[in-house]
Structure formats: C-alpha cells, structure tokens
Amino acid sequence: MNVFRLSGDLCHLAAIIILLLKIWNSRSCAGISGKSQLLFAMVFTTRYLDLFTSFISLYNTSMKVIYMGCAYATVYLIYMKFKATYDGNHDTFRVEFLVVPVGGLSVLVNHDFSPLEILWTFSIYLESVAILPQLFMISKTGEAETITTHYLFFLGLYRALYLFNWIWRFSFEGFFDLIAIVAGVVQTILYCDFFYLYVTKVLKGKKLSLPA
C-alpha cells in the first residue's frame, strides 16, 4: 500500500465520520441528501459482495466492513431515526437517471462478464456520480452548512488522492485499471467547482452556495 491510497482511505473515513457526527450531534439530517447516501450504500453493497469469499488483508476486510456499516447507519439515521428532519422537498434528484444508465454501462463495459465483476463495475461507475443528488440539493437550497462542506471536501479529496494512487501503481507496479481511472476522473471533475468554492469561501469563514 502506498501513501496516496492510505491518505485517500483516511480522508474517506474522515468524511464518513464527519457526516455521522454532524447528524448525530445536531439530531438532524437537514441539508443532507438521503438519495446520495442510498446510492453510496448501494455502491458499497455491490462492491463488497466478495467480503465472505475472498481475503486480501485484515486492513482491506476491516475497511470494507466499516464502509458498509457506516453507509447503512447513515441511511438509517436519515430515513428512520431523524426522518422528521429530512428535507425531502429539496432532495428531488431523479436517481433513476443515474442508476439505469450505470447499470447498462456496467453490463456492456467491464473486465469480465460474471455477476460479481459486473456488480463491482456497477459500483465503480455509480460512485463516480453518487454525489450528484447532494450537489443538486445544495444548488436548490442555495447554501450548505459548514460541516456539510467539510464532509464534501474530504470526500472529494479522497477521490483525488486515489488518482495519484493509480499513477503511483502504474509507475511502480505496472497496474492499470482503465474503468476505475476514468470513473475516478469523472468523480473528481464533479468536485472541481465545489473545491474552488470551498477554498474561496468556506476557508475564509463564508457560507458556501452553489449557483442554481
């Protein structure tokens, strides 16, 4: 494991913890897209179906369990425990416009036409666009809480660091996964506008807002 992957994993974990603490401490999921969190839960579920059939390392298995557990916990908090605070009126992105094309693409473009491989590919494609309902929700409400922007920043940073991880692995291990790289680039591009606003506004103590 190289420093970029480890740093990326830590940023990903930090983003998840920030989100869970934000919801739990405020006893509210206001400003959080439940649809994005459902998509992330779907991502981890379809990606880690090999949890009980293959073992790479204790670290790898532990992170899989943590990601899945936190994803399910987040969905539970939004749609059950703090359901009364969920802003469904603004969380209106049509997720079928993401899931259906991604499902079709994963069947057509994959490394191996087997159920587990197709589902893994589906998770890679879906993760690249899963944040869109959250960004759409922010654009509709006009602004986002500072703690929510921190969550998004670490989530975007995780993906950017993984791009460097792939460059490292190609340079030193000869590893090249075009599907993961293209999906990662797409995901990072989606965060570019947010990164700019985060640096120019949030870090200067201003509220973040996305253009409607």
From Swiss-Prot:
GO terms for biological process: protein retention in ER lumen; protein transport; retrograde vesicle-mediated transport, Golgi to endoplasmic reticulum. InterPro entries: ER_ret_rcpt. One of its GO terms (molecular function) is ER retention sequence binding. Pfam families: ER_lumen_recept. One of its GO terms (cellular component) is endoplasmic reticulum membrane. Residues 25-32, 80-92, 136-149, 200-212 are cytoplasmic. It is a multi-pass membrane protein. It comes from the Eukaryota. Residues 47-48, 159-169 are annotated as: Interaction with the K-D-E-L motif on target proteins. The record marks R5, S54, E117 as: Interaction with the K-D-E-L motif on target proteins. The chain crosses the membrane at residues 5-24, 33-52, 59-79, 93-110, 117-135, 150-168, 179-199. Residues 204-207 are annotated as: Important for recycling of cargo proteins with the sequence motif K-D-E-L from the Golgi to the endoplasmic reticulum. The record marks D193 as: Important for recycling of cargo proteins with the sequence motif K-D-E-L from the Golgi to the endoplasmic reticulum. Keywords: Cytoplasmic vesicle, Endoplasmic reticulum, ER-Golgi transport, Golgi apparatus, Membrane, Protein transport, Receptor, Transmembrane, Transmembrane helix, Transport. It is found in: Endoplasmic reticulum membrane; Golgi apparatus membrane; Cytoplasmic vesicle, COPI-coated vesicle membrane. Residues 1-4, 53-58, 111-116, 169-178 are lumenal. Receptor for the C-terminal sequence motif K-D-E-L that is present on endoplasmic reticulum resident proteins and that mediates their recycling from the Golgi back to the endoplasmic reticulum. Binding is pH dependent, and is optimal at pH 5-5.4. PANTHER family: ER LUMEN PROTEIN RETAINING RECEPTOR. Binds the C-terminal sequence motif K-D-E-L in a hydrophilic cavity between the transmembrane domains. This triggers a conformation change that exposes a Lys-rich patch on the cytosolic surface of the protein. This patch mediates recycling from the Golgi to the endoplasmic reticulum, probably via COPI vesicles. Belongs to the ERD2 family. This is ER lumen protein-retaining receptor 2. It comes from Xenopus laevis. The lineage of its organism: Eukaryota, Metazoa, Chordata, Craniata, Vertebrata.
